[in-house]
A protein has these predicted regions:
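RNA-binding accessory domains that recognize and position tRNA/RNA substrates
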Residues: 1-14
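Long, charge-dense tracts
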Residues: 225-229, 245-430
């Protein structure tokens, strides 16, 4: 097992660096720009620098500017040179290495960018044509005493980006915000372009294409579909290391050597662990055991069927095409046959008649395995006269509301609406896009859950493979469990999930909260609020603790799956106070869960043909940080979708000063997270995020689009978002 990082050693321990002072005389915007692209050294904390450079003895603070082009046109009042021993301070040494790496690539005309966690993102030209340039991005990050003794360089292939060859000033229709530009060798948001950038470049900065401006510049966004993520990522990182990093020029200009050549770091055996085999087992409707819902759910049905039958009805547009798709979908779900019973209006001419004949032949040739009832192990009830049609997108909400207010619906019955829509979930038209959310909200206000099906998917020859996904989601929405975990972690744990979602065009992020009350993955309550609305979150947590105690007794542990790395001190105190008010004394653990991305440090298994580790593997990265792999590979070199691992940071949530966690506690928590990853019922395809985070994130994604920006009461006890 290796990680995408290579060991380096410094050739020059002592280096001469430029440091600056006197930025207080600059404008506020210049001060902010300078501070953002420098590290600050101060008296008291960083006395080693004052001891090495007597010239700065009268300064209280100095700055080392390691992103130099970003501060072009900004000149602090004072400039000093100091001899710096790289062994004296890791923080400054890392900045010096970063500066040297950025200089090396920019000297070779490669744009560089600091990403949101401080890594160097290098943009390498991949393709050029008359109108655009495509870049392949790579990230580089120096670390000290992480995966080896001493220094290492993490190297990863990132995403692609496309840049227009036409400068911004020549495209009058471009907005003032919402995209980044290449400015010299920098990547800068357009809204942060200042006069100093115009002066330095003569106004020649070029827009980076994103979905918001793609139509304006007439260039498609970059999209590279990868079917072999792990092997291709490792190969790309190796090629980049060989061609650009492990070279004489890099060694000389950055001042490093590679003691192990161009080899990535091998992980010691004690860092690589595996969850117990029994933790991988799932259970289905006939109590059959298995590990892969994609292969097994269709044959064995749900672990827990919905207790009460639901009545189904359709919502579609009022036109012939929609009626045609409605009848087709009804027959697919009810009889596993894709035909329409001649539901079209009469043909208008011979050409139309011939077209419909061919279309019927194509439809009838489609294979559908079995009706939805055989997946659900429960026959759906279709009640005549319940289906609703609407005239247009503009009148849809009013017409559906009027229909729901009719006497056809009864409060003692449970309903599920099947919405057939021609609006894709990524539709760029804002009004059409919002209709999707408003329909969901309206139905919940009347206590009705819903399943949305994109009309064009019904035409797909692979629609047969959509049906198990629809069935799994319906089971969850109707209160059942599509599958469960066979072997549960012992103990009476209360598990809380808090996820966040920040979306383009919505200023403040929203939190979604899910309170899981048993280890099978059953939820009792959802909610969503703005990220700064801590009162609502605290109130929900307190109610949930009391409900948990009433149903299951006092918890042995409170485990919070959280979108942040750790609780603030005041957040810990508030939770501890709540537990005391409920007369509960139990440990609190916080698990930060993040999906590893292309650019992260991840582990590769060289014994697997595609380099992806087996499901259940977890890697101890550092401190309390781990990588956890959940996929469908259960045998060496078995076929499976390539899913990136999740990064876990496990910390003590109490203010008791105890940070060391017991090995067995860590193992139980990681096993629990692994099992929650395997209970995702939105699809039969395995996911790599636990439902304690994935479901709250879905809730937080929907709520900002609702008319009242709050979750209807019905939606707090129902998996409506699947």
């Amino acid at each position: 097992m290796i990680v995408n990082s290579t060991k380096i050693e410094l050739t020059n321990e002592v280096r001469v660096i430029d440091i600056f002072a006197g930025i207080g005389g600059l404008s506020v915007s210049y001060q902010n720009a300078y501070k953002k692209n420098s590290i600050r050294m101060s008296v008291g904390r960083d006395d080693f620098l004052w001891n090495q450079c007597s010239e700065i003895e009268k300064e209280d603070e100095v700055f080392f500017n390691y992103w130099e082009e970003e501060t072009i046109g900004i000149t602090p009042e004072k400039n000093y040179q100091a001899e710096f021993d790289m062994s004296k301070n890791v923080r400054l040494a890392k900045a010096v290495l970063t500066q040297s790496i950025v200089r090396y690539f920019r000297k070779r005309n490669c744009p560089c960018h600091r990403d949101f966690i401080g890594r160097v993102e290098v943009w390498m030209k991949a393709q050029e044509d008359d109108v655009s340039t495509s870049y392949q991005k790579f990230t580089i990050q120096p670390r000290f005493n992480d995966q080896c003794d001493g220094w290492q360089l993490d190297i990863a292939e990132g995403r692609n980006s496309v840049v227009s060859m036409t400068p911004v000033k020549d495209i009058a229709e471009l907005p003032q915000d919402g995209y980044d530009v290449i400015c010299n060798h920098c990547v800068i948001p357009i809204k942060r372009i200042e006069q100093r950038h115009w002066t330095a470049t003569n106004g020649l900065f070029y827009p980076i294409v994103n979905p918001g401006i793609s139509g304006t510049v007439g260039i498609k966004c970059s999209h590279k579909r990868e079917t072999d993520k792990f092997a291709s990522k490792l190969a790309a990182a190796q090629t980049f290391l060989d061609s650009w990093i492990c070279t004489d020029d890099f060694k000389r200009e950055v001042g490093v050597i590679f003691p192990n050549g161009n080899q990535f770091i091998s992980l010691p055996a004690d860092k690589v662990m595996m969850v117990d085999e029994e933790a991988k087992e799932l259970v289905y409707g006939d109590r059959t055991d298995g590990k892969s819902p994609r292969l097994e759910f269709r044959n064995h049905g749900p672990y827990k069927r919905p207790e009460t039958p639901f009545t189904y009805f359709f919502i579609t547009k009022d036109d012939d095409t929609s009626k045609f798709y409605r009848m087709r979908l009804f027959n697919i779900l009810q009889y596993a046959k894709d035909y329409c019973y001649g539901n079209w209006s009469k043909p208008v001419d011979e050409k139309d008649k011939e077209f419909r004949k061919k279309e019927d032949a194509r439809i009838n040739a489609k294979t559908i395995d079995k009706p939805i009832a055989e997946y659900l192990l429960q026959r759906p009830i279709w009640e005549g006269g319940l289906s609703c049609t609407y005239t247009s997108d503009q009148t849809a909400i009013a017409e559906i509301r009027k229909h729901l207010q009719s006497s056809r619906f009864h409060t003692d019955q449970k309903y599920i609406a099947i919405i057939i829509t021609d609006i894709h979930r990524d539709d760029q038209n804002k009004e059409r896009h919002e209709l999707y959310y408003l329909m969901k909200e309206l139905l919940m206000q009347y206590g009705i859950t819903s399943q949305v099906i994109y009309r064009n998917n019904i035409d797909s020859t692979s629609f047969n493979w959509f049906i198990p996904n629809i069935a799994a989601a319906l089971v969850g929405k109707m209160g059942g469990m599509a599958w469960g975990v066979k072997s549960l972690v012992k103990g009476n744990d209360m598990i809380v999930g808090i996820g966040a979602c920040k979306q383009r065009g919505i200023k403040k992020p929203y939190l979604g909260s899910a309170f899981c009350f048993d280890k099978e993955g059953s939820f009792r309550n959802f909610n969503s609020c703005r990220a700064d609305d801590t009162e609502t979150l605290q109130s929900d947590l307190k109610k949930s603790i009391l409900n948990f105690c009433e149903d299951y007794g006092k918890p042995d542990r409170l485990i919070i799956h959280y979108y942040k790395k750790k609780l603030k001190r005041e957040e810990s105190e508030q939770i501890e106070n709540m537990l005391r008010q409920c007369d509960i004394d139990c440990p609190i653990y916080v698990v930060n869960v993040v999906t590893a991305s292309n650019e992260d440090l991840i582990a590769f298994d060289l014994y697997q043909f595609d380099k992806m580790p087996m499901s259940g593997t977890y890697i101890h990265l550092r401190g309390t940080e781990y990588l956890l792999y959940n996929n469908e590979r259960y045998t060496p070199n078995g076929k499976a979708d390539k899913l990136y691992p999740i990064k876990l940071t496990i910390s003590n949530g109490s203010n008791n000063g105890i940070n060391n966690l017991d090995y067995q506690v860590v193992r139980e928590i990681i096993t629990q997270v692994y099992q929650f990853c395997r209970l995702y019922w939105k699809s039969v395809k395995m996911q790599n995020v636990p439902i304690t985070i994935a479901y709250p994130e879905l809730v937080a994604k929907y709520v900002p689009h609702f008319s009242y920006e709050e979750l209807p009461e019905f939606g707090r006890k129902n998996l409506w978002m699947l």
